[in-house]
Amino acid sequence: MRLTYFDDAGLFNAQQEPFIVIGGVIVHADAQLIPLEEHIDRLIHEHIPEGDRTGFVFHAMELWHGGRYFDRENWPLQKRLEILADLAAIPAKFDIPVSFGYQKREHAWRFIDPAKLNTREVELQLYSDTYARFCESIEMFMREAASDEITVLIGEDNDAIHAVAKMAQQHYRDPNWVKETAPLLTYFPFERIRESVHFAKKSESKALQIADTCTFIIKRRLMNDPHIGPLYEALEPMMVVLLKPELLTEQSC
């Protein structure tokens, strides 16, 4: 059985975020989860002062920008990037697939009429579309590479998207809904993604911290951040997506 841990980036921040991204990691529950958790504990022990280790959670955005716990005064850029590199190396180290879906905000008019929706409704519709793209990549991987297994999705606990994600996944598993709404999509209805989507806090699930790292790096890559290259290159060999990873540039989106 696989557990797919995912997080989102760019939601509810239309002024500064040109993309909404949902990214995650597909973890073999029996073979990979415990070694993954133990490795994150080792990174906490290696990088974080003893008094701060209990319940510590890595956040990629804080590491990248130097905010909150990782403030720039106490955590120089070189050290923060070292920690980020250690986190980004985890998927390849443990042979854990990485996947994602994204939506570019300026293309939303193709399927959303902003005149009929308020700002929050537009954001949630964008999230729903992005979630479909992400789940489709997960379903593709499960059918093609792990066809004798199932996966359950576990997302970062965010009250704002609970209902949207649960309803979307219910639709994507319903043959009648798919037949009426999206009959030409190859990996719908879902067969290997089972149950409803579940949610947890990063403090409760160490694997979600890796989903956070992957999602942040992929978003920065989409934004053509000139400094994200080494971190993205660490993830790229583990990418399982419908879109070729080398097409991950702003111009191709």
Language model features with spans:
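Phosphate-ester processing/binding pockets and catalytic centers
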Residues: 1-253
